[in-house]
């Protein structure tokens, strides 16, 4: 569990008056321009008061004019990222965006 979330926890659970943000896992592609994908998900989750975690499915080369390249990660790498978050931090909600390939969706 990240230090920011660990700090609020005591032996009986969450400390009196401590508000733990919802833990949101965003599964999506990475947009190099920051206008969409994981980058936009992190911004939105943070503004809404959540704790953002990510599993990157693909890396894109894009800007305001369009997408020029996409490179999907392996399903094993995506699964490893998801497991790393779920097994340690826990997840309250999942947001799914671009999966990158049919193999990742399977």
Residues covered by each model-derived region:
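Small-residue (G/A/S/T)-rich helix-start motifs and N-terminal tracts that mark the onset
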Residues: 14-93
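Short linear motifs centered on Gly/Pro in flexible linkers and helix caps
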Residues: 6-7, 27
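N-terminal basic, low-structured, amphipathic or hydrophobic segments
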Residues: 1-5
């Amino acid at each position: 569990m990240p230090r920011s979330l660990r700090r609020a926890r005591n032996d009986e659970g969450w400390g009196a008056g401590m508000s733990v943000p919802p833990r949101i896992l965003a599964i999506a592609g990475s947009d190099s321009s920051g206008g969409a994908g994981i980058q936009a998900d992190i911004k939105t989750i943070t503004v809404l008061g959540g704790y953002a975690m990510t599993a990157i499915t693909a890396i894109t080369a894009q800007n305001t004019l369009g997408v020029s390249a996409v490179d999907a990660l392996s399903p094993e790498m995506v699964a490893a990222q998801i497991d790393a978050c779920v097994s340690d931090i826990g997840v309250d909600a999942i947001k799914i965006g671009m999966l990158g390939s049919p193999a990742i969706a399977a």
